[in-house]
């Protein structure tokens, strides 16, 4: 039913949808949702931080940036067997996807990347969808991940191109788009979304949805995060997002990207079950489960399963939309590492609150 998908949404059109009376917005979103998806099925993904902290970037929301003092303990890359154990646990808890996150600016060819490729092979062989979020990557690196059996690659746009400059100064918005472009040259699906509650306007939220919805095909998954303001980060003072904003954002995302999995991501601990149920009604059909999301608290998986039971919802099986990728063993790989790293722009502007948080961390 992809004939309903439109790739030329304008910012004004999206703002008009977002601002509709809530009952109309919910009705429209729920109608589209039911045409494309089973409303009682929700995908459960588990996020694993395979390498935490110590990142050289300055993202204003992020407790893993080395320059901010947030109490995050940096650690080394997890071993393949540790990851396998976590994936098996996730599978037994109803997850159909494992997303592995490394706090890297970009992928570097070498031992650590080889280890990540082995993790991808291992999880794909457990018959689970594998997703990675490892920062920027080259086309060759994307090909090697695809060959290992990667199902999805996550690279969030975070916000609109305009507001991006107030969040991050160590790379540009166009660098995000380039990595997504590199992933799309392979058969790996794209997962890309953003964060609300960073001080952005509704125009910025719409701008982010323009950037995502004009991709063709549209992303397979779009995570919608509510900022969790962490002490020590530049955004520690931001007020929590109201549940109505989350519901509107989910509904609007569903309307402009009918076939996408819309994922409730960070910030669910601050949402009541009623609030989450309204998000599911509005078109959210994916959640992150597990005790924490990288470094942020998350509801207990048993609580989530109880909520599903209350709502009469079931967890989605893996590989419903796209067939399971085949895994090619390292020895049979068609792609040699090129020893290259992604190029990125250095925008050169400064962000006052990021600098202040960085100075404060040294005191």
Swiss-Prot record:
Domain Radical SAM core: 40-268
Binding of [4Fe-4S] cluster, residues: 55, 59, 62
Top EC class for this record: transferase
Record bears the keyword Cell inner membrane: no
Binding site for [2Fe-2S] cluster: 99, 131, 191, 263
Pfam families per record: BATS (PF06968), Radical_SAM (PF04055)
Annotated catalysed reactions: (4R,5S)-dethiobiotin + (sulfur carrier)-SH + 2 reduced [2Fe-2S]-[ferredoxin] + 2 S-adenosyl-L-methionine = (sulfur carrier)-H + biotin + 2 5'-deoxyadenosine + 2 L-methionine + 2 oxidized [2Fe-2S]-[ferredoxin]
Single GO MF annotation: 4 iron, 4 sulfur cluster binding
Cofactor(s) the protein requires to work: [4Fe-4S] cluster; [2Fe-2S] cluster
One GO term (biological process): biotin biosynthetic process
Keywords from the UniProt entry: 2Fe-2S, 4Fe-4S, Biotin biosynthesis, Iron, Iron-sulfur, Metal-binding, S-adenosyl-L-methionine, Transferase
SMART domains registered for this protein in UniProt: BATS (SM00876), Elp3 (SM00729)
UniProt pathway annotation: Cofactor biosynthesis; biotin biosynthesis; biotin from 7,8-diaminononanoate: step 2/2
Superkingdom of source: Bacteria
Statement: the UniProt record of this protein carries the keyword Oxidoreductase: no
Cofactor binding note from Swiss-Prot or TrEMBL: Binds 1 [4Fe-4S] cluster. The cluster is coordinated with 3 cysteines and an exchangeable S-adenosyl-L-methionine.
Leader peptide range in chain numbering: none
EC number, as in UniProt: 2.8.1.6
Family note: Belongs to the radical SAM superfamily. Biotin synthase family.
Cited function: Catalyzes the conversion of dethiobiotin (DTB) to biotin by the insertion of a sulfur atom into dethiobiotin via a radical-based mechanism.
Subunit structure: Homodimer.
Protein name (record): Biotin synthase
Origin species: Flavobacterium johnsoniae (strain ATCC 17061 / DSM 2064 / JCM 8514 / BCRC 14874 / CCUG 350202 / NBRC 14942 / NCIMB 11054 / UW101) (Cytophaga johnsonae)
Lineage: Bacteria, Pseudomonadati, Bacteroidota, Flavobacteriia, Flavobacteriales
